Amino acid sequence: MNNPLVSIIVPVYNVQNSVARCLESICAQTWKNIEVILVNDGSRDESFSICEQFREKDPRIVLVDKSNSGVSETRNCGMSLARGKYVQFVDSDDYLDPDFTERLVTAAEANNADLVIAPYWICLLYTSDA
């Protein structure tokens, strides 16, 4: 298998409490040939600042700051910058297993697939007065 570039697009909007964990998981992927396109959609919290800190540490990260226009236009903005053979969308409140991208690329390459859909886990965290 060759080593195709994967463009990981992350829309960012007011996620200061979750975006660092998301970016840590992306930067720790076992598939190293990635570009990470962070598109800040006019966040009013510290999300953009957190993204800047990650961009300073990892040259694979591209950071775009734009006015708020919604998640669909934000993803499209990321797509317009993507250079990879494959595109992976990750929401900024999600985090990935270390081999997530590698498994997607392996499946796509092995099956000459145009689309790979990944399973996901939902973990609900709450406190109860009961």
Q: Which residue ranges define each predicted feature?
A:
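Nucleotide-sugar donor-binding/catalytic module of glycosyltransferases
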Residues: 1-128
